[in-house]
């Protein structure tokens, strides 16, 4: 019987530090040619204005095979659902047996934050104490938490066109990580930067 791991389960068993170490190890194995990571396959459901993304991977060290399946349905906002949903399946690569089903969105956010921390670890100054984050959506907290593990961050600046999201992020990160300043940018102020 496969193990089912929800977001709450995963939060209890995987730390940001664990994620950084695992992702860095995965990068080393990938660079060493020990991983098989095919190009992401997508399936569009135009009639429902959605898309499914399939991302399998096999890592020879550890004999690990997993597949992430993500769906993106922008109209879910009107349904009160998240636009992005996902699951991660872990299979036994010898037998194909399903070992676990895990919340794919939490793992993706944790992995993406960890990847940013690894880039920061090797590319940023050792004494970097300020962090700038553009956008305060769901990924922002993971980025901040991971980067705070590899640098002595004392201030975080967040910019967002949604002032409520920026305030919410600022309050949470100030409580959990380090003081956060935020700036609210209205869309018309950002357009010159984009065009």
For each feature predicted by the language model, list its residue ranges.
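Glycine-rich adenosine-cofactor-binding loop
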Residues: 116, 128-148, 160-161
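NAD(P)-binding Rossmann-fold cofactor-contacting core
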Residues: 151-173
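Conserved N-terminal glycine/acidic-rich loop preference
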Residues: 106-128, 165-177
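Acidic, proline/serine/threonine- and glycine-rich low-complexity intrinsically disordered segments
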Residues: 179-181
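Acidic/polar active-site rim loop that often engages polyanionic ligands
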Residues: 3-5, 148-152
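N-terminal ligand-binding/catalytic initiation module
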Residues: 1-109, 117, 127
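Conserved small/polar residues in nucleotide/adenosyl-binding loops
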Residues: 183-190
């Amino acid at each position: 019987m496969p193990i089912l791991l929800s977001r709450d389960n995963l939060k209890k068993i995987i730390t940001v530090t664990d994620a950084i170490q695992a992702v860095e190890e995965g990068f080393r194995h990938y660079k060493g040619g020990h991983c098989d990571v095919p190009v992401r396959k997508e399936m569009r459901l135009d009639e429902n204005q959605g898309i499914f993304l399939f991302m399998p991977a096999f890592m020879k060290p550890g004999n690990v095979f997993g597949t992430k399946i993500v769906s993106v349905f922008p109209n879910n906002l009107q349904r009160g659902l998240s636009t992005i949903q996902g699951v991660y399946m872990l299979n036994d690569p010898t037998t194909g047996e399903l070992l676990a089903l895990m919340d794919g969105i939490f793992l993706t956010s944790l992995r993406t934050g960890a990847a940013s921390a690894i880039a920061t670890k090797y590319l940023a100054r050792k004494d970097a104490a300020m962090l700038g984050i553009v956008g305060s959506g769901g990924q922002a907290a993971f980025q901040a938490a991971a980067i705070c593990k590899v640098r002595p961050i004392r201030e975080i600046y967040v910019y967002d066109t949604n002032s409520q999201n920026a305030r919410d992020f600022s309050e949470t990160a100030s409580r959990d990580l380090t003081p956060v300043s935020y700036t609210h940018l209205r869309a018309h102020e950002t357009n010159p930067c984009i065009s």
